[in-house]
């Protein structure tokens, strides 16, 4: 489970700009909901090789009613889940009643809060920050997110320490969890009403999860250990991710954060899609997030019963077009959670994906496969020299990590990296799991000797003169 940073504040103070800076916006997990200013964005960020999640909560106002009231509640959920809160204010506009309202909400929470005074370019930073100390938070810091002024200092000063402390505690907790973990830990993810809870009950063989024909009836993530055919599992049914424009009831808990955390905490992720609705951008966002986090993956296309053959052909074509990047290694099952059709095959794929993700590969095998791949198709030339791959070893599992050492590996094209992945996948018969390749530039063992010789020759030439 990742460390979570929540960015909060009233509208138009620069929260989205700060979000883009922290996540390098192209990495953002963005859901295509109506209303740009209302959108909450979820992004992955990295600090010193430590991953963390960032959520941009949208504007908070004391006048929120209806849909806006729902969104304000969602912002509060994000704050409750957060390990650190960046409370963004506008240094140009100064303190407003809207800021006071947000501050009053934050004071009710036992959270680490940093008041981030944005838009201070062209102003005196100390003067811009002065009035915001009245909120009662001891950490106040001035930046210009648009010009990236002081943004690195912001994370260095306020994120580094709590992030490192969190992962020290988390590593110990996770090691304990792994020891206590009940078999294969897998999560069911997807939008509301695609049948995740029905599938959970079908897998368990009993009605353990409340199911109604209404989106969002699973209010929170539910973890249930069970056993099937001698294999132990723990299943997590996450509250669904739904399109915000369709949200009408404020009691429904929109829990993207819970879903993302469940993905990170799973061995295998089962993405459940409604065959009648087709695959959406939300589905794709969650699938990409799972792959980026190295999770083994199975796809279950639910509500397959009762569809005409013509509709089934159309659904398969749509899946092939939108999930082209999964065709090579992810099992896709067409199921009926209600009637149990093909659910047994989903279990088989979960077992296979887990076994592949944890398969042990020796350094000798990794190097041999790399050499076979190079013999079949050599790396390209760079200038007058060919890129040379020397040896490989395993850098981890779940997902499998293959580390390849060589010369000029930084210039290896993506097409050749994909070739290597496909070659290893086919040779090792990997199903359901991504394979991560890392490329390391080989050190020249004679570099120091060469430098020393050059210095000696230089000294001799001086003496000759």
Curated annotation (Swiss-Prot):
KH-like domain location: 359-443
Region (Disordered), start-end ranges: 446-465
EngA-type G domain ranges (all copies): 3-166, 184-358
Pfam families registered for this protein in UniProt: KH_dom-like, MMR_HSR1
A GO molecular-function annotation: ribosome binding
Record GO biological process: ribosome biogenesis
Keywords noted in UniProt: GTP-binding, Nucleotide-binding, Repeat, Ribosome biogenesis
Positions of GTP 2 binding: 190-197, 237-241, 302-305
Residues holding GTP 1: 9-16, 56-60, 118-121
InterPro entries listed in its UniProt record: G_ENGA (IPR031166), GTP-bd (IPR006073), GTPase_Der (IPR016484), KH_dom-like (IPR032859), KH_dom-like_a/b (IPR015946), P-loop_NTPase (IPR027417), Small_GTP-bd (IPR005225)
Residues spanning the signal sequence: none
Alphabetical list of NCBIfam families matching this protein: GTPase_EngA, small_GTP
Function summary: GTPase that plays an essential role in the late steps of ribosome biogenesis.
Subunit structure as annotated in this protein's UniProt entry: Associates with the 50S ribosomal subunit.
Family note: Belongs to the TRAFAC class TrmE-Era-EngA-EngB-Septin-like GTPase superfamily. EngA (Der) GTPase family.
Protein name as catalogued: GTPase Der
Organism of derivation: Francisella tularensis subsp. tularensis (strain WY96-3418)
Gene: der
């Amino acid at each position: 489970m990742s460390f979570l940073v929540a960015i909060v504040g009233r509208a138009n103070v620069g929260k989205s700009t700060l979000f883009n800076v922290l996540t390098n916006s192209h990495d953002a997990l963005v859901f295509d909901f109506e209303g740009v200013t209302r959108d909450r964005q979820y992004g992955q960020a990295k600090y010193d090789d430590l991953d963390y999640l960032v959520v941009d909560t949208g504007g908070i106002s004391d006048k929120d009613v209806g849909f806006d009231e729902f969104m304000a509640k969602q912002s509060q959920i994000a704050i409750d889940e957060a390990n650190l809160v960046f409370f963004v204010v506008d240094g140009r506009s100064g303190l407003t009643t809207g800021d006071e309202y947000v501050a009053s909400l934050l004071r009710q929470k036992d959270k680490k809060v940093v008041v981030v005074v944005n838009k201070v370019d062209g102003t005196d930073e100390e003067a811009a920050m002065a009035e915001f100390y009245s909120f009662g938070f001891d950490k106040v810091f001035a930046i210009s997110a648009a010009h990236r002024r002081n943004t690195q200092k912001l994370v260095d000063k306020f994120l580094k320490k709590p992030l490192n402390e969190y992962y020290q505690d988390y590593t110990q907790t996770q090691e304990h969890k792994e020891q206590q973990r009940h078999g294969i830990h897998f999560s069911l993810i997807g939008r509301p009403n695609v049948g995740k809870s029905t599938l959970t009950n079908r897998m368990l063989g009993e009605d353990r999860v409340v199911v109604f024909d209404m989106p969002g009836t699973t209010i929170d993530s539910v973890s249930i250990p069970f056993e099937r055919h001698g294999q132990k599992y723990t299943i997590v049914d996450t509250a669904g991710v739904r399109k915000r424009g369709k949200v009408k009831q404020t009691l429904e808990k929109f829990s993207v954060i819970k879903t993302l955390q469940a993905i990170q905490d799973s061995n295998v992720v089962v993405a459940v899609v409604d065959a009648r609705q087709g695959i959406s951008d939300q589905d794709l966002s969650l699938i990409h997030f799972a792959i980026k986090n190295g999770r083994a993956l199975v796809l279950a296309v639910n509500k397959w019963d009762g569809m005409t053959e013509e509709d089934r052909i159309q659904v398969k074509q749509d899946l092939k077009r939108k999930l082209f990047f999964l065709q090579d290694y992810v099992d896709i099952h067409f199921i009926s959670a209600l009637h149990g059709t093909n659910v047994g095959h989903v279990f088989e794929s979960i077992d296979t994906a887990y076994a592949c993700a944890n398969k042990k590969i020796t350094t000798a095998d990794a190097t041999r496969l790399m050499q076979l791949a190079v013999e079949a198709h050599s790396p390209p030339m760079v200038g007058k020299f060919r890129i040379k791959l020397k040896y490989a070893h395993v850098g981890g599992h779940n997902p499998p990590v293959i580390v390849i050492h060589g010369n000029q590996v930084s210039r290896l094209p993506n097409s050749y990296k994909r070739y290597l992945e496909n070659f290893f996948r086919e040779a090792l018969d990997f199903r359901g799991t991504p394979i991560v390749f890392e490329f390391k530039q080989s050190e020249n063992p004679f570099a120091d000797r060469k430098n020393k010789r050059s210095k000696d020759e230089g000294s001799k030439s001086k003496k000759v003169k």
